Amino acid sequence: MNGTKRLISALSGLIICFQSCSTAVSDCQEHFIGTNFWYGPILASDGPGSDHERLSAELDSLKSIGITNLRVLAGADGEDGIAVKVRPALQTAPGVYNEDILKGIARFLNELEKRDMKAVIYLNNAWEWSGGYGTYLEWAGAGKCPDTRRDGYGKYIDFVSQFPVNEKAKELYWNHLRFIVERFKDSKAIYSWQIANEPRCFSSERTNQDAFVDFIWRSAALIRSIDPVHPVSTGTEGRMGSELDMRLFERLAECPDIDYLNIHIWPLNWSWIHRESVEEDLPAAIRETDRYIDEHAALARRLRKKIVIEEFGYPRDGFEFRKGSPTSARDAYYSHIFERLTESAEKGGELLGCNFWGWGGLAAQNPDHIWWEPGDDYCGDPSQEEQGLNSVYMADSSTIALIREANAKLAATVCLEFPEPESWLMCGTDRRCVKVDFFCAEDCTVKAGAAFVSDTSLMGAADTISYICKEVELKAGESRRVEFEADLEPGFYEFRISVGERDGQMRHRREFNIGIEPEKIVSPLSAKEDFDAFWEQSLRELAEVPMDCRMTLVPEYSTSRRNVYEVEFKSLGGATMGGIYAEPVQPGKYPAIIEYMGYGAEPFHYWGDDNPETVQLLVSVRNQGIFLDEGHWILRGLDSKENFYYRGAYCDAVRAIDFICSREKVDCERIVSKGESQGGAFCWISAALDHRVKAIAPAVPFMSDFEDYGDIVYWPVHEVLEEADRLEIAHDRIFDLLSYFDIKNFTSRVGCPVLMAFGLQDPTCPPHTNFAGYNMVRGEKEWYCAPLCGHGMWQESEWVKLREEFLQKHLND
């Protein structure tokens, strides 16, 4: 196949539609500040704990401060009378229900509907305070669940870690799920269904984690099959509830039946703050909170899903429990969360809403004890926690005022969304326009300005190629799409959107990259007359260096199917290189995959049972990977092309092929390579300087188009030029040197099939530089674009899948 095939990430932009019965109501841009009100259905019931008058007063109070989204427990499971568990229970035995609580759920939803309020209903609990995991295991015959107050959380966690692998316990839960969802699915007050409160695996064992992921996926699919109208979420805390493993959280989030992500944030529980220094530890709490939000927002962005921070809490000053006691630190913490939400709404970010924990409202406190006892009012703190620990009461005047003001500000905010990010890369007959959705909860008219800035001017004057200003009239609660169109030449541009504020000032909201006809970008070659001779001589010198290979078995990663080794061997100039090598145990000839590492990337070991019929080499070039030293490799040897670090490193990329071909079990007709960033550059080199590689898959390749590179971003070109100034080397000499290592000067030599990936938002190896090399390839080639991705293409599961399919195809040809 000649020419180019284009592949653009096929994930659709996020649209969450909340529907009521047969009438669809799109609330995809309705951001909210809500609360946790776990005991609402109990107040609405007819039995013990009921208080209809208080329920009405609480809902009216919540509505008065702008809260319309309530996260609630469907009901507790198991026997009553356990101190750490809320009562009365909804499900007293498998499939046996307390009719009073069932009526309470119905009445609660009806009262919400009257007030145009919504409920997120969670159906299970990993923790002891409503039965959940522990009760289902008891009913399944797994033994008696430990009492956390008497036996401690260690024993409790050991016990409930059985839940993901106990088929009978899960089936009992699924029966409950079917019953509740079927019974209440037609309520107009349902915001979404939630699988559980803080579902956890409680195990680092792979078998347990796989079973846990399967449990979440099957639960979500079951809810969807019963109620295809309302959204579904997991209820998980995020990384902290996923055995500190972001990949485990991602596996849950990838479920197609999970509509939005949840995270919880607990500075005290997670030891970001301490009881004796609640106020003093506030800066640390905010810092860690921002990190936590950011890492999960990055995942949500990749998956095109929104996030709700559905639990967060902060103690009172001095670690008091009394309602009305000072809450200066809590108020500051809440304010920060609310600001993060509003800022995200303004910029079209990933945060959809937040629910603080929890609502104490009008509850009275018993002055004689701090733990809940029968007859006490319910508050935001369940029975296993000190009453007043995290509750927000109407008597907490400063907090109530803060919530009211934050909701008012959110309602007046003009929110943006940026649909169809696939359209940000425009080719052929595609219209040259960017779509923006505007939304406000109130009627308003705003000015919107859009600028298109050439990427090659970003480090200089930031030339605006086109500027468009429009007046946008918005009706309360309705979204309006506006298109900004410009006549643009082939290239990449930064799109900047500004919105007029109520004071008349235009304020910048967001910027992102777009692309126009990238295959028509022209970046002239910069190779010098002796370019070919230089590399021919370098390869001759490399061939004269004995490999002197050493292999050390790594038993902990080796299996009966494949052995894993750490290897080292010699390259140009006698420098040591090597990496991690895996080959099948059984005799035979096997295909080989060479994987080149990024700049300063940490090495990892292959696992023996993964790809057992394939040879793999993770390449560590000189002074990197398993031979890592102090870094700054691109600054080494700037005095001459012969001494420049990348002369040796490029030869190392070729020497890796020499090593692979020296192995008896390698089929030298079936070798492919892959890599990202610096590794992507080495991929190009492996095919340009050596023709034993049958296909390559470079992603976000480094080291290309240095002339334009420095006009787009600071690193690495400006750092190199600063070092040149220190060494008193003229800039033109530096660019002459770099031309011998510029990937675009190599790629016309590539004769094998190529699949290149790039992140449209890459701030490290900008897409302009990727295409400078790609466009010089004359043979079979195709590219893949991840429109929301920056430099981390390894996180793009769709790309990883396509890459592996591409490489396997050419290994099997």
What are these regions (language model features)?
Residues 581-583, 589-599:
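Short beta-strand element of the alpha/beta-hydrolase
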Residues 600-657, 707-717:
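Cap/lid segment of the alpha/beta-hydrolase catalytic domain
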Residues 355-358, 362-370, 771-813:
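C-terminal catalytic histidine-bearing segment of alpha/beta-hydrolase fold enzymes
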Residues 185-190, 635-677:
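Gly/Ser-rich "nucleophile elbow"/oxyanion-hole loop immediately N-terminal to the catalytic nucleophile
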Residues 543-586:
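N-terminal cap/lid segment of alpha/beta-hydrolase-fold proteins
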Residues 750, 756-758:
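Short beta-strand/loop motif that positions the catalytic acidic residue
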Residues 680, 684-730, 785:
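Hydrolase active-site cap/lid region
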Residues 27-272, 282-305, 315-329, 345-389, ...:
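Active-site mouth of glycoside hydrolases
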